[in-house]
Swiss-Prot record:
Cell compartments where the protein resides: Mitochondrion membrane
Biological process (GO), any one: meiotic cell cycle
Gene designation: mug116
Keywords: Meiosis, Membrane, Mitochondrion, Transmembrane, Transmembrane helix
Major site of localization recorded for this protein: mitochondrion
A Gene Ontology cellular-component term: mitochondrion
Organism: Schizosaccharomyces pombe (strain 972 / ATCC 24843)
Protein name per UniProt: Meiotically up-regulated gene 116 protein
Length: 135
């Protein structure tokens, strides 16, 4: 598990970087989280766990509790469309979206260590890190 000291250190580093590198919050947070993951070890006895969460301004940052199978790094901004009902979409549009999802799935970074995935979030820009343990 991520210790309280490690959590505070990552939190402090994030706040420092947020102050001086405004446009790179998510990038730096991802780097530090991956670095933190490498240090941690995965407990085989663990079936499920919750990661410590920090709410930092308009971002919700979830830090992994152990070496993840992959990190789902989801980032959405105003460039993404608001969610629509499936019934309203045309067949061509659905096919195009499915193709985009497939491309995203194939673009795995560091052999499935970090996966960039788009989400529809029309309220605000959010940066979320989710971890899954490899058993």
């Amino acid at each position: 598990m991520v210790s309280r000291v490690e959590s505070v250190i990552v939190f402090a580093l994030y706040k420092f970087l947020q102050r001086y590198f405004h446009s790179f919050h998510c990038f730096f947070l991802l780097c530090f989280t991956v670095m933190l993951c490498v240090v941690q070890q995965c407990s085989s006895a663990m079936t499920s766990f919750r990661c410590p969460t920090f709410s930092l301004s308009k971002y919700t940052c979830v830090l992994p509790a152990s070496i993840p199978e992959m990190i789902l790094f989801t980032f959405s901004s105003h460039t993404f469309q608001t969610p629509t009902k499936k019934g309203n979409k045309t067949k061509k549009k659905r096919k195009k979206e499915k193709k985009k999802e497939t491309i995203v799935e194939k673009n795995k970074v560091l052999k499935s260590f970090a996966l960039y995935k788009k989400i529809n979030n029309y309220r605000s820009t959010r940066c979320v890190l989710v971890c899954q343990c490899k058993y």
